[in-house]
């Protein structure tokens, strides 16, 4: 009977028909668009450029505060202090490696990890996490504001005791009686002033700074304060703040004077603990210090033995591919290379690095074309290889003659830095396979003196073996006087 009563309502509800969907939902509208999902080809000059100059703001992590705690027991009614010291803040470290080649992966603001606070049972706070930034080999550090970076020694900073604050627990109490009494009788206002001064000295921080990446020179920059030229080399650019003292260490410090001993006889530790808790925020002993701050300008100067310098579309990238296993981007238009490319040329008992520098034009020192900022990458090179286009200006075509190209290249190097062209040099006469290039080569040898000229065809790899031997002789040196291309040795008229 009860089963029939349960089935009847279910049948009654099932008699209702489900609402049908409206026609516009049964037949959805299909939208069409003329927009193609296929992405268009990116223009050549829209390629991401190399970021070889970067402004970095670094700040060390904050130190942890000391703990104010009391351990009580049946035998000790008032208890004993057992608060631990705060941990030391994390550092900001720069490490050079072959894994990166520019500063595109860096963030403009970086801060070390915050340290942990001390806890009861005399436990020390955790040390802040170090922030390690990877930079390419050849990074030069310019200091705008802050402390000078220091090189990391073999001993890691993590091995140091975080409670090892300079001049706190290692002093002889007997030799500092007068100073201890003076510290105990200081007023609260004097303590606040001392705390503020100590924090200011510890920070060494700028008040206001513009952290955008400009090309403008700043007046108060300390140039070349540090360089990273070896794999795995590390430099600390911002140190973490020291941790504050817990009431265990603070009590030991107070007990070091005779005045404090007489005071302790009259007052118990509980009253001292209450006073310490009330002045916790104002106490410079128990509060952790802030980390140091610095504003740095990072600049990349690639380390290469040979620098390929030439006008746009002279065939430098193709030549680099013929000399080494590098695969730079090659195109039939000017300014194909937007970033320096590096390649290794290996011999049986010798190896050297060749850098392909983006093309230079006349007036590059006035920021024409790609400018001359990339020339900093050849400041460390031993040899300059001037790559000229023999086919330029032939048969009424537009372009400069090879000797005019050499004159403009030497002038742009000197405009960038005086004496930059005064190093071992040779000339690479590229595109020797073009019609009329042989006569142009003879004219080039007549107009340019004092430097060896190597005719090559980078596409067909003709003359590349002789060029490798010439580069090896200049890089290796062997005590022989090197040849230098000078402006007075180029006859243009």
Swiss-Prot record:
Residue stretches making up the OBG-type G domain: 304-476
Transit peptide, from-to: 1-28
Subcellular location: Mitochondrion
Domain Obg as annotated: residue spans: 48-303
Binding site for GTP: 310-317, 356-360
Pfam annotation, one family: GTP1_OBG
Main location: mitochondrion
InterPro entries the record matches: G_OBG, GTP-bd, GTP-bd_Obg/CgtA, GTP1_OBG_dom, GTP1_OBG_dom_sf, OBG_GTPase, P-loop_NTPase
GO molecular-function terms, A-Z: GTP binding; GTPase activity; magnesium ion binding
Region Disordered: start-end pairs: 65-89, 146-215
Family classification: Belongs to the TRAFAC class OBG-HflX-like GTPase superfamily. OBG GTPase family.
The protein's role, per its UniProt record: May bind GTP and have GTPase activity.
Name of the protein in its database record: Probable GTP-binding protein OBGM, mitochondrial
Source species of the chain: Arabidopsis thaliana (Mouse-ear cress)
Lineage of the organism: Eukaryota, Viridiplantae, Streptophyta, Embryophyta, Tracheophyta
């Amino acid at each position: 009977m009860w089963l029939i009563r349960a089935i009847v309502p279910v049948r009654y509800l099932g008699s209702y028909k489900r609402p049908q969907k409206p026609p516009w939902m049964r037949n959805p509208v299909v939208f069409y668009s003329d927009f193609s999902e296929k992405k268009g080809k990116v223009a050549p000059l829209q390629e991401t450029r190399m970021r070889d100059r970067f402004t970095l703001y670094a700040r060390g992590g904050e130190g942890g505060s000391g703990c104010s705690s009391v351990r009580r027991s049946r035998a000790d009614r008032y208890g004993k202090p057992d608060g631990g010291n705060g941990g030391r803040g994390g550092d900001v470290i720069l490490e050079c490696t072959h894994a990166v080649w520019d500063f595109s992966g860096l963030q403009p603001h970086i801060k070390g990890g915050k340290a942990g606070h001390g806890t009861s049972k005399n436990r020390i706070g955790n040390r802040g996490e170090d922030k390690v930034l990877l930079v390419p080999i050849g990074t030069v550090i310019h200091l705008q504001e802050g402390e000078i970076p220091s090189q990391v020694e073999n001993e890691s900073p993590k091995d140091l005791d975080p409670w090892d604050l300079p001049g706190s627990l290692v002093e002889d109490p007997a030799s500092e009686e007068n100073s201890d009494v003076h510290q105990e009788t200081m007023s609260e206002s004097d303590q606040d002033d001392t705390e503020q001064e100590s924090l200011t000295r510890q920070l060494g921080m700028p008040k206001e700074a513009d952290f955008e990446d400009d090309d403008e020179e700043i007046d108060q920059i300390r140039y070349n304060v540090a360089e990273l030229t070896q794999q795995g080399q590390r430099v600390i650019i911002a140190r973490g703040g020291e941790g504050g003292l817990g009431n265990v260490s603070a009590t030991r410090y107070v007990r070091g004077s005779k005045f404090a001993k007489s005071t302790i006889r009259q007052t118990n530790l509980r009253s001292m603990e209450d006073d310490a808790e009330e002045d916790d925020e104002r106490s410079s002993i128990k509060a952790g210090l802030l980390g140091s701050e610095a504003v740095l300008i990072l600049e990349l100067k690639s380390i290469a033995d040979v620098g390929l310098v030439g006008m746009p579309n002279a065939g430098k990238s193709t030549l680099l591919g013929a000399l080494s296993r590098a695969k730079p981007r090659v195109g039939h238009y000017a300014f194909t290379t937007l970033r320096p490319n590096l390649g290794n040329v290996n011999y049986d008992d010798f190896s050297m690095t060749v850098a392909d520098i983006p093309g230079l034009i006349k007036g590059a020192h006035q920021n024409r074309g790609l400018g001359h900022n990339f020339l900093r990458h050849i400041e460390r090179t031993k040899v300059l290889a001037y790559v000229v286009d023999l086919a330029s200006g032939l048969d009424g075509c537009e372009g400069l003659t090879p000797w005019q190209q050499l004159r403009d290249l030497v002038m742009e190097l000197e405009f960038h830095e005086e004496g930059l062209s005064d190093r071992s040099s040779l000339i690479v006469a590229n595109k020797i396979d073009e019609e009329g290039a042989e006569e142009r080569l003879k004219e080039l040898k007549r107009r340019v003196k004092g430097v060896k000229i190597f005719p090559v065809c980078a596409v067909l790899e003709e003359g590349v073996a002789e060029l490798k031997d010439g580069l090896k002789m200049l890089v290796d040196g062997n005590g022989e006087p090197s040849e230098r291309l000078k402006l007075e040795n180029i006859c243009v008229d």
